[in-house]
Amino acid sequence: MKPILSCSDVDFTYQNSPAPTLRDVALTVQPGECVLLCGRSGCGKTTFSRLLNGLAPAFYPGALAGQCTAAGLAAGEAAIEDYVPQVGSVFQNPKTQYFNVDTTAELAFPCENSGLPPEAIRARVTETARKFHIEPLMGRSVFKLSGGEKQQVAFAAACMLSPKLLVLDEPTSNLDAAAITRMHDMVATMKQCGVTVVLAEHRLAWITDLVDRYFYFADGALTAQWTAAEFAALPPERLTEYGLRGRTLDACRAEITVKQCRECLGAPMLTLENVTLGYDKKNPLRTLPNLAFGAGEIVGLMGRNGIGKTTLARTLCGLMKPLGGKICWHGRPANEKQRLHNSFLVMQDVNYQLFSDSVQEEILLGAAHPECCDEVMQALRLAGLADRHPMSLSGGQRQRVVVAAAMLSDKPLILLDEPTSGLDWGSMQQVGRLMQALKAQGKTLLVITHDEELAAAWCDRVITLS
């Protein structure tokens, strides 16, 4: 059988980059396989996926050497429009691939661009919505969807032209457990239809039953590969050596259950009394019971997409005003200005808070202790990237840059919204160790997360919004 994906001696160097991002990559993938690209953040997974869907070098200019053919299309030679019907793509952030403001139009968009007649488009939209069980999402505003719902619609849109190959780049990094289960089912549906699936992913537990082979990248090179059986036989310590996350979350979930029963540790620093969250008094999001956060503790905040975790964080740090109730700082009511002065928020989409021309400048922006910059950069594996532009980094590397800036801010309250989104096991552990160091300084950390491995290993207690 002819491979649907074939690469030999592939090198790729981004424009203005001093070193290649991919080096001597050689592999083949057979039709109908589900393969997973794994490795530490910045190892080249995303760049490789861009070669498969034609985004590199068409939209991400650079020098390509070697041969990389996906679905019969040669990277660097085929026109980008030739990839559209053959290769479907789902990105880490679904907002980056939306072209319409309602879900039905978003699904129809690929077919409209391909010149299909209206009746055929309507039939495909109906059939795709049925196949992926997203009929209730049709006709909805994309601005009113949860993160998981947005990713479902993006996945369905990528399948509208019946591609031979699906390329998924960190599709679950911002999803809750229920949304991840739905993503699993969508991938399973496409695999059953004979579609080849290539996943670049750090989270492994949700997809192990569907993956046929694993490709491990390190420093831009393909250094190891395993069949599903070989990967399942790897001892846990080997996974840790490779910087890979666990194959199962059972132990993590048991630990989180224990931590959900714990109360505030120590004297409360920040308290909430019947605080109502939302953007409009006529339609409040939710009212919280009394909550307390102690100095020197790490609190995980969990719950499904759209439940109000980020709204709570924005309210606590002074970016939003509560619709009702009282927020106190060391027993005294604190207004938005006071809360903003005492807190640092690391956003879920860190692209909104990257302003400087180099990684080092970004980390030092607003730093209270610039003398600690080198130490923090070293701990977060950013030392070799000091002079790089933040927007030239991988998603996981950008996340670490903003986390580093938070570490140097010297704010007593640090709120982290999905701080390990897109991070490998080693980087997640580094973030956890730095959180512990901040805790030792008496700081309070509120960590909004779907990352069960992070919550189980590093949070003192867990609050789950339901």
Residue spans for each PLM region:
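Helix-to-loop junction immediately C-terminal to a conserved catalytic motif
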Residues: 53, 317
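Conserved ABC ATPase signature
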Residues: 141-145, 149, 389-393, 397
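H-loop/switch region of ABC-family ATPase nucleotide-binding domains
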Residues: 201-202, 449-450
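Conserved ABC ATPase "signature" region
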Residues: 119-137, 371-385
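ABC ATPase C-loop
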Residues: 159, 406-407
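ABC-family nucleotide-binding domains
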Residues: 176, 424
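Catalytic Walker B motif of ABC-type/P-loop ATPase nucleotide-binding domains
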Residues: 166-169, 414-417
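Conserved ABC transporter NBD signature motif
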Residues: 61-74, 325-339
